[in-house]
Design a protein with these regions (language model features):
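Conserved beta-hairpin
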Residues: 49-62, 67
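Conserved beta-strand-loop-alpha-helix junction that forms the acyl-donor binding cleft
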Residues: 102-121, 137-138
Length: 138
């Protein structure tokens, strides 16, 4: 069973989130690893609607968050179908997406995944989740 710890944030959580960041295999939002101080400032701003550290059997499994555009970030050390199902279910059971705003925000939760994260992409395909978008830098 997975346990979700809401990011407050405190020193322990900032360290664990930095550990996850330094070991992340794929990234969407940054090219270079921030310093611990930069990371600490970012986390302290509490930039997401909600952010959780995820534990399984008292071991840090990853993190998940919801942004103001209803996107859900999922960062797992070793993604697997069962954990993704449990995380998705927890998000949907405990949170409602923000109302849609035409041309700005969908009325549903959605997950952005790095195109290099083949494991997570395959998990969502096996779960018959609909792909709605591909993004390109210009």
């Amino acid at each position: 069973m997975i346990n979700f710890e809401k990011v407050i944030p405190n020193k322990k959580q900032i360290k664990e989130l930095y550990h996850l960041l330094t070991n992340r295999r794929y990234s969407i939002s940054h090219q270079n690893l921030p310093s611990f101080e930069e990371h600490s400032k970012f986390v302290s701003k509490n930039p997401y609607l909600v952010w959780y550290l995820i534990y399984k059997n008292f071991e840090l499994l990853g993190s998940t968050y919801i942004q103001k555009d209803n996107s859900v970030g999922i960062d797992l050390k070793l993604p697997n179908k069962e954990d993704v199902i449990e995380i998705s279910s927890y998000i949907k059971k405990n949170h409602l997406p923000l109302k849609p705003v035409k041309s700005l925000r969908r009325g549903d939760f959605f997950v952005n995944i790095s195109p290099f994260d083949k494991e997570l992409i395959e998990i969502f395909k096996k779960l018959n989740q609909k792909e709605i978008q591909r993004s390109f830098l210009i």
